[in-house]
Amino acid sequence: MRRRYASTILFPCAPYLSFFRSLGAPATVNVEVLQDKLDHPWALAFLPDNHGMLITLRGGELRHWQAGKGLSAPLSGVPDVWAHGQGGLLDVVLAPDFAQSRRIWLSYSEVGDDGKAGTAVGYGRLSDDLSKVTDFRTVFRQMPKLSTGNHFGGRLVFDGKGYLFIALGENNQRPTAQDLDKLQGKLVRLTDQGEIPDDNPFIKESGVRAEIWSYGIRNPQGMAMNPWSNALWLNEHGPRGGDEINIPQKGKNYGWPLATWGINYSGFKIPEAKGEIVAGTEQPVFYWKDSPAVSGMAFYNSDKFPQWQQKLFIGALKDKDVIVMSVNGDKVTEDGRILTDRGQRIRDVRTGPDGYLYVLTDESSGELLKVSPRN
C-alpha cells in the first residue's frame, strides 16, 4: 500500500565547510512509499514508455516495479553473485540503444577460486514481457580478485558518446589504487560492446591495464553525468572523514591513499598518506571532513519543480538522509538535507522521467520512495 508523508529538510551547521550556504527557512518534502519489504535494494533504472523500473537487490535478485502492478517476481537469467559483506548484485543501467536491443547491463561481485571476490560487469537482453534476462554475457572482470567483502564500487554510467564507465573500489587493499597493473581503485572505460576504446589514456603503455580511465579511487558509490556540462561526476567514501566528489579526467590520479582528507578508523593517519594536497594528484571539487557515507547521486534535470533546478542530490548511508547541493559549473555547495527523519540508509537516488525524485533505502525491509518538494 502506498503511504504519504511530509519530511523536513535539516540545514546543518558545519563550520569546517567554508563553502556552506544556507537556503534560509526550512522547507519540507512530500514522500510517498511506492514499495516496501525490499531486501537491501541497491540500484534502479527507469524503463521507457511508462513501463516502470528495474530494481536490483543485493542478495542477487532483479525485480521489475510498475505503478498499478507493483513488484514482480525475480527475473530469471541474472548471473550468480557473491552476496557477502558489501558484495552482491549491484548496479543496473539500460544500454543507449535499449529501444532496439533491449540490452541491460549489470554489475555484481563474483568469487574466484581462492575465495576472494571482485566486481564483474555484463549485459543481457530484457524480455518483452519483463520476466527474464536472456543471453547474459560477462564482458569485464576486476582482476586480480582481492576482496574479502569490502569496497567493490560497481556504479555504471554511459556517457553521451555511448562509452560505459565502471567505478571500481580498491577491495580494501589501499596500495592497489595506485597500481596501474591492477583494476582496484580505478575508473574503467569501455565501449558499448565491452571492448577497450582506442583512445583510452594507457592503451599504448606496457604493464598498464588499458581499461583504466583514471585511478587513485577508494570506494566509489555514486556516479552520474552532469546534464549541463556533459561531464562525468563521481563520489567516493573516504575512511574516517574525507568523502569526496570528483570530476574524473582522462589519465588523472585522484590520490588515494597518498592524498586524503580523512584518517584511519583507528584515529591514526593512513600509513601511505603524504597529506591532503599532494603533487601529482587531483583535488576533489568537494569533500566532507565528517563522512556522511555518500551513495547514489542524481542531478535534477527536469522542469517539473523549478526550486530544484541546478541541484545535485546524494544519498547518505551513515547519516541516513539525502544531501541537497547547488551546482554552479564545476563548483558545488551543500544546501541542506532531506529525509532526515526516516532513519534509513539511503542507497540510490534518481531523477525520474516524470520529474520526481526516486530513492531506495538500504535496509532488510528497504523502501522505494517518491519524493517532491512541498511548497
Model features per residue range: what roles?
Residues 25-30, 69-73, 126-137, 194-209, ...:
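Beta-strand initiation motifs
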Residues 333-353:
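Conserved blade-ending motifs and adjacent loop-strand segments that build the rim/top face
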